[in-house]
Amino acid sequence: MKQETKCLHSGYVPKNGEPRQMPIYQSTTFKYDSSDAMGRLFDLEDSGYFYTRLQNPSNDMTAAKIADLEGGVAAMLTSSGQAANFFALFNICETGSHIVASSAIYGGTYNLLGVTMKKMGIDVTFVDQNLPEEELAKVFRPNTRAMFGETITNPTVSVLDIEKFARLAHSHGVPLIVDNTFATPVNCQPIKWGADIVTHSTTKYMDGHGVSVGGAIVD
């Protein structure tokens, strides 16, 4: 399917007798016939919807649409773009880890990496993304766990050489995480160029109307 078709139809395939358009499930909880059934869900022994903070059909369908647009396997929605970046990085890093990141990134993300994660014992080296590969390779350490950049930087609108960053990251055995907020998957799919994980602030162009705050992680 073309991207335009995916925007309209991906993520939701109605079965016989189901709504033609993707419904919005406005419920915090879901009903089951017994407390035993609920207990198995809360213990994560069975799969199913029981509490919207953990899972919701509307969220899952939207995440599936974003994953399809990005060419990923799956996606997860978050409360904001910064939450998406935090979860993507913190799932990989721990105290004592090191991150290599482009210095030409959104101010909130720069603060997340340079201040918030530093308080957690995670170090970051910010680099000029336009330096040649041999210069960038010098900043990697044995404890480097991830490389980070933005497809189109906010607000300087510099374009990241994703293939170059991917080569560097993979040659050092770490994943490349790319924030694709400004480009959106309509204009660029970083996974095609070597990125391993893609993040979004859906608040920006993906929302398109300035009425909601959200984020997404695509693997």
Role assignments for model-derived ranges:
Residues E4, E70, E150:
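Acidic-residue sensor for enzyme active/binding pockets
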Residues C7-V13, A75-D219:
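Conserved PLP-enzyme active-site core in the AAT-like
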Residues M1-N56, A64:
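N-terminal "arm"/small-domain region of PLP-dependent enzymes with the aminotransferase-like
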Residues M1, P19, Q55-N59, Y106, ...:
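Generic structural signal for well-ordered, non-membrane alpha-helical segments
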Residues S34-F86, G108-T116:
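Conserved N-terminal alpha-helix of the aminotransferase class I/II PLP-enzyme fold
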